[in-house]
């Protein structure tokens, strides 16, 4: 659960039952006409893995898509290309991967989640 789901600095995600990303936004999503107390909102933790073909498509656009520009979230360009994005739910705080040594920590978490 996010500490501050209204923060525009934290992209929020909505995922379907197949663990595919439906949408990501800096706005509070999913929205509701009613006030829902204690609603759990999920944030994006980035580990991107795309094949060469998908990356070539991404860079072939040469510029940000309209929705990518509005949200300032690069993963939305893959939406415009029709590329599905799989998600993994983490029940703990996010792990930063800023150095090579951090990769092993992240891989261990992913492996344990895939076994569930």
Predicted features and spans:
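Conserved core of the sugar-phosphate nucleotidyltransferase
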Residues: 1-64
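Conserved alpha/beta core of the MobA/IspD/sugar-nucleotide pyrophosphorylase nucleotidyltransferase superfamily
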Residues: 39-116
